Amino acid sequence: MDEDGLELQPQEPNSFFDTTGADATHMDGDQIVVEVQETVFVSDVVDSDITVHNFVPDDPDSVVIQDVIEDVVIEDVQCPDIMEEADVSETVIIPEQVLDSDVTEEVSLAHCTVPDDVLASDITSASMSMPEHVLTSESIHVSDIGHVEHVVHDSVVEAEIVTDPLTADVVSEEVLVADCASEAVIDANGIPVDQQEDDKGNCEDYLMISLDDAGKIEHDGSSGMTMDAESEIDPCKVDGTCPEVIKVYIFKADPGEDDLGGTVDIVESEPENDHGVELLDQNNSIRVPREKMVYMTVNDSQQEDEDLNVAEIADEVYMEVIVGEEDAAAAAAAAAAHEQQMDDNEIKTFMPIAWAAAYGNNSDGIENRNGTASALLHIDESAGLGRLAKQKPKKRRRPDSRQYQTAIIIGPDGHPLTVYPCMICGKKFKSRGFLKRHMKNHPEHLTKKKYRCTDCDYTTNKKISLHNHLESHKLTSKAEKAIECDECGKHFSHAGALFTHKMVHKEKGANKMHKCKFCEYETAEQGLLNRHLLAVHSKNFPHICVECGKGFRHPSELKKHMRIHTGEKPYQCQYCEYRSADSSNLKTHVKTKHSKEMPFKCDICLLTFSDTKEVQQHALIHQESKTHQCLHCDHKSSNSSDLKRHIISVHTKDYPHKCDMCDKGFHRPSELKKHVAAHKGKKMHQCRHCDFKIADPFVLSRHILSVHTKDLPFRCKRCRKGFRQQNELKKHMKTHSGRKVYQCEYCEYSTTDASGFKRHVISIHTKDYPHRCEYCKKGFRRPSEKNQHIMRHHKEVGLP
């Protein structure tokens, strides 16, 4: 390899093609420098024809070097000859509206050979031939030195310019040539601008890879190029720079992340070199490979489920890219392995790195979305490029029968986007696959069983499994279930089942919930419950305990409660050393522990004593406190209200306070007042035969039937029921023959409907229906109801 024609500019976003054989660092003399802004590969210029071959240089002076820096390639190409200034004939100019660059240097390419992947021009005749993707115009400008400049605009698709015997530039479909101040720029544009924007909007799947150092391109005569980790170059360059390994990690990032597409440097002490590549720097010390993280996002929600050619990407995939050169021995071994890999795989698919990991072998129709040409990169596992997940053919699985809930949100571009929300934590995902993968973070919900056995801790999702399990319990006799749980009383046949059951009680105790006694609020922390009580229930319970937050209505209740926290026990048993904070607990203690020893009991408070003297002394306490003596008996009360209640309830047999509506009597006016309030809003029904009133009409009908039917001379021989008239008895006898007939006791009305009969008695034989029909005596509440009745049932009689 000729080092004189080698120029590597690792941080410049352009490419230069040198046509001289001199050192590339001197850009003067007879030379033409072609600046390529994006990915364009130009090889040696040989003869009058422009031919394309697969990056195999016929001239050893031609070298192609690619530097992958934000998808920009730098190349320096030597050309053998250049024409004299007098032979330079014309310049093709494309304004900035096409590719934002100009060409002003007059260039004449006479004898050059350009490979297939290079977009170049050929000077052939006096006519200008432009392909359909190049926009040209007929505008002609003649310079001072006699050269003709062809100005190309956006508006004209194709034009022919006839001048002196000049040459013409044939521009490829993939290249637009522009005019600039010092150098001819060949700019590659794989997609038209309009189509580029459309494609960018249709699909946003991308994988961004950024390297800080130059890579190496291997030339293959039949295929594209591969970026390989091993090389046949000497281990160190002339300037003393030694090779370096960059390990690039590819992660599937969350689409909600803000830093998608970036790279993150990892400290050199953290990563592990899985492939055992040890590199020496200039001081012969081992250098740990640097690592970079590259994030990927897949935004097409339909891609994962529908596209079967899409390769599944592992969660953590990385590839090693060697920058510089490697040891010759290691490079030779790697080259042999690479050739073996190429023999095994007869057809290699090369595609831009931006799509290689994300689309697997689906390379048809894939173009760069952001308008830049990416380096063709083949990721080869055997060549040491990393642990990329193997593309194994997947079996076609049955579609998931579960229904996933979807939601529609507004995406970053302002268009509606269908997402799959997680029903547990609320996160949203752009495909069902991402949601399924995310659901693994909620194992407690995935493993939750629907059916639980009531006799043991067995759980299952299948009803038939639970049924079979319950059948096994039936086979086990009750005698075998001798082990009982101390906490809940369940029985188990063996100690192992009991131990598993007790673990449930421990888990419940660890997750104990503190519930508010005044509402349904509950929490696992006592402090949160205290704050809830202070914030919500402090108005109803103004006296709050400062220790636990419990509220009370009266200070005495709070004082009694505070004894729990202070440990104060003022009440002591007189028969033993038992002490209590509450007097009621002391009474309970005495009744349960000392009742047999003390047979004498107080009639008032039911306290027991060991002898009669203690009972008499205790009775004096009750007599001193009760100063209100009843005049009718020996009863004493502590206050006058208790004495009044005693007199009314014991010594008053009559009820002086009577209700005006129903004549019910009460001892006290307060009781009568409550009773009268019950009558409000209710209409009273008056019996027509007596002064009986009742709010319930059905009760009134029962009153009439039971009270006002005593004179019944005609009785039935079968049921001994009496009737006032003989025709009523005849109607009654029909009931014994079959269907029951209800006969009104006040009129000749009879019916077989019990509810109709009750309505008849209420509406006809009560005073609550003042408006009565003149023909049938049926009563109505309003005159309009009576008129409607007459028009419906007595129409012929009512008409004059």
Swiss-Prot record:
<dbReference type="GO" id="GO:0000978">
    <property type="term" value="F:RNA polymerase II cis-regulatory region sequence-specific DNA binding"/>
</dbReference>
<keyword id="KW-0863">Zinc-finger</keyword>
<feature type="zinc finger region" description="C2H2-type 1">
    <location>
        <begin position="420"/>
        <end position="442"/>
    </location>
</feature>
<dbReference type="Pfam" id="PF04704">
    <property type="entry name" value="Zfx_Zfy_act"/>
</dbReference>
<dbReference type="InterPro" id="IPR006794">
    <property type="entry name" value="Transcrp_activ_Zfx/Zfy-dom"/>
</dbReference>
<feature type="zinc finger region" description="C2H2-type 2">
    <location>
        <begin position="451"/>
        <end position="473"/>
    </location>
</feature>
<feature type="zinc finger region" description="C2H2-type 4">
    <location>
        <begin position="514"/>
        <end position="537"/>
    </location>
</feature>
<feature type="zinc finger region" description="C2H2-type 11">
    <location>
        <begin position="714"/>
        <end position="736"/>
    </location>
</feature>
<dbReference type="GO" id="GO:0005634">
    <property type="term" value="C:nucleus"/>
</dbReference>
<feature type="zinc finger region" description="C2H2-type 12">
    <location>
        <begin position="742"/>
        <end position="765"/>
    </location>
</feature>
<feature type="zinc finger region" description="C2H2-type 3">
    <location>
        <begin position="483"/>
        <end position="505"/>
    </location>
</feature>
<comment type="similarity">
    <text>Belongs to the krueppel C2H2-type zinc-finger protein family. ZFX/ZFY subfamily.</text>
</comment>
<feature type="zinc finger region" description="C2H2-type 5">
    <location>
        <begin position="543"/>
        <end position="565"/>
    </location>
</feature>
<dbReference type="GO" id="GO:0008270">
    <property type="term" value="F:zinc ion binding"/>
</dbReference>
<dbReference type="Pfam" id="PF13909">
    <property type="entry name" value="zf-H2C2_5"/>
</dbReference>
<feature type="zinc finger region" description="C2H2-type 7">
    <location>
        <begin position="600"/>
        <end position="622"/>
    </location>
</feature>
<dbReference type="Pfam" id="PF00096">
    <property type="entry name" value="zf-C2H2"/>
</dbReference>
<dbReference type="InterPro" id="IPR036236">
    <property type="entry name" value="Znf_C2H2_sf"/>
</dbReference>
<feature type="zinc finger region" description="C2H2-type 13">
    <location>
        <begin position="771"/>
        <end position="794"/>
    </location>
</feature>
<feature type="modified residue" description="Phosphoserine">
    <location>
        <position position="269"/>
    </location>
</feature>
<dbReference type="GO" id="GO:0001228">
    <property type="term" value="F:DNA-binding transcription activator activity, RNA polymerase II-specific"/>
</dbReference>
<dbReference type="InterPro" id="IPR050752">
    <property type="entry name" value="C2H2-ZF_domain"/>
</dbReference>
<dbReference type="InterPro" id="IPR013087">
    <property type="entry name" value="Znf_C2H2_type"/>
</dbReference>
<feature type="zinc finger region" description="C2H2-type 9">
    <location>
        <begin position="657"/>
        <end position="679"/>
    </location>
</feature>
<dbReference type="GO" id="GO:0000981">
    <property type="term" value="F:DNA-binding transcription factor activity, RNA polymerase II-specific"/>
</dbReference>
<feature type="zinc finger region" description="C2H2-type 10">
    <location>
        <begin position="685"/>
        <end position="708"/>
    </location>
</feature>
<protein>
    <recommendedName>
        <fullName>Zinc finger X-chromosomal protein</fullName>
    </recommendedName>
</protein>
<keyword id="KW-0805">Transcription regulation</keyword>
<dbReference type="GO" id="GO:0006355">
    <property type="term" value="P:regulation of DNA-templated transcription"/>
</dbReference>
<feature type="zinc finger region" description="C2H2-type 8">
    <location>
        <begin position="628"/>
        <end position="651"/>
    </location>
</feature>
<comment type="function">
    <text>Probable transcriptional activator.</text>
</comment>
<keyword id="KW-0539">Nucleus</keyword>
<feature type="zinc finger region" description="C2H2-type 6">
    <location>
        <begin position="571"/>
        <end position="594"/>
    </location>
</feature>
<keyword id="KW-0677">Repeat</keyword>
<keyword id="KW-0010">Activator</keyword>
<keyword id="KW-0238">DNA-binding</keyword>
<keyword id="KW-0804">Transcription</keyword>
<keyword id="KW-0479">Metal-binding</keyword>
<keyword id="KW-0597">Phosphoprotein</keyword>
<keyword id="KW-0862">Zinc</keyword>
